A protein has these predicted regions:
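Bacterial carbohydrate/catabolite-sensing allosteric modules
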Residues: 3, 46, 87-92, 140-147, ...
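Short, surface-exposed alpha-helical segments at coil->helix boundaries
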Residues: 37, 79-83, 135, 199-210
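Active-site-adjacent beta->alpha loops and helix N-cap segments on the catalytic face
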Residues: 130-141
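Short gly/ser/thr-rich secondary-structure transition/capping motifs
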Residues: 46-52, 106, 127-128, 258
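N-terminal helix-turn-helix DNA-binding module of bacterial transcription factors
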Residues: 1-63
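Central regulatory/effector-binding core of bacterial HTH transcription factors
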Residues: 87-132
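N-terminal helix-turn-helix/winged-helix DNA-binding helices
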Residues: 2-7, 45-83, 92, 102, ...
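Short beta-strand segments enriched in small/hydrophobic residues
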Residues: 14, 21, 58-74, 181-195
Length: 278
């Protein structure tokens, strides 16, 4: 006999037992004979029975699901972090529901609302949004929220490294290695900031770079927001007696820069240095 997906009531009737007995069998609880349990499980498979987890979650007040709203997964840093979160969640009996904002604040809002409608037990957010209105929206959801990478405000639990201090340490380390000209690569920073996107983390890196230069007495430095090949190659080949290093705010532009220099016969690290934050 062929069945379509059935309800717990239909499965109980087919097995000749109560709904409570079916519930004990499919959830592996005590108070039921092994032979009865096996019969119910066999019938459940034949009848394609699927427990209504949403109804169950409403009854117990939790879905054992965590929502993750990330920027994207093209950056290896985000991909590895999301994978680690998923593995840890599963070890604690939770599954994750993932949505990507693709650097679009509107898509981020849609994703957050989606998670709330699915009654996730909490949201791990890589925020693009910022400000009082955004914070108020999140608080009204009544869902525990942890932010990663960009900070919103102190009311939310935040997980990140001290980007500002780390970048100061980077400048100090490079100065000790003999580099005396440090060019900072920060693609599209002002465009993102003026567009209302949360740039807290990368702004802290930029501030740390500038503070590091001041501490090492290396002048005002040079910040580039466009990955212009002619300009970058020109700087790298400039014969001015300076030992140059390009500091990239993350590894993505660092990899692009290495490829660009290799194609233009610029040796790394013999001719210039490259370092990425991530």
């Amino acid at each position: 006999m062929i069945y379509i997906s059935c309800t717990i009531k239909e499965l109980a009737k087919a097995c000749g037992v109560s709904e409570g007995t079916v519930d004990r069998a499919v959830n592996n609880r005590s108070g039921i004979r092994e032979s009865t349990k096996q019969h119910i499980l066999e019938m459940a498979e034949q009848m394609d029975y699927r427990p209504n987890h949403l109804a169950k979650s409403l009854a117990i007040g939790g879905t054992k699901t965590i929502g993750i709203v990330s920027v994207d997964l093209s950056n290896n840093f985000f991909a590895l972090l999301v994978e680690s979160i998923e593995q840890t969640a599963r070890e604690h009996g939770y599954f994750v529901n993932l949505a990507l904002s693709h650097n679009d604040p509107e898509k981020e809002m849609e994703a957050i609302k989606y998670m709330a409608e699915r009654r996730v037990d909490g949201i791990i957010l890589f925020p693009l949004g910022k400000g009082v209105e955004f914070s108020s929206f999140l608080k009204k959801l009544g869902i525990p929220i942890v932010t990663i990478y960009n900070r919103i405000e102190c009311d939310f639990v935040h997980v990140d490294v001290d980007c500002r201090q780390i970048m100061r340490n980077v400048v100090s380390f490079l100065a000790q290695k003999g580099y005396n000209e440090m060019i900072y690569i920060d693609p599209h920073f002002e465009k993102m900031k003026s567009g209302g996107i949360n740039v807290f983390s990368i702004e802290q890196r930029r501030i740390g770079y500038l503070e590091g230069l001041k501490e090492e007495m290396l002048g005002d430095g040079e910040i580039l927001e466009d990955m212009d090949e002619r300009q970058l190659v020109g700087i790298a080949k400039r014969k001015d007696g300076m030992r140059k290093v390009f500091i990239c705010r993350n590894d993505t532009p660092a990899v692009r820069l290495m490829t660009m220099f290799r194609e233009n016969n610029i040796r790394v690290p013999e001719d210039v240095g490259i370092i990425g934050f991530d």
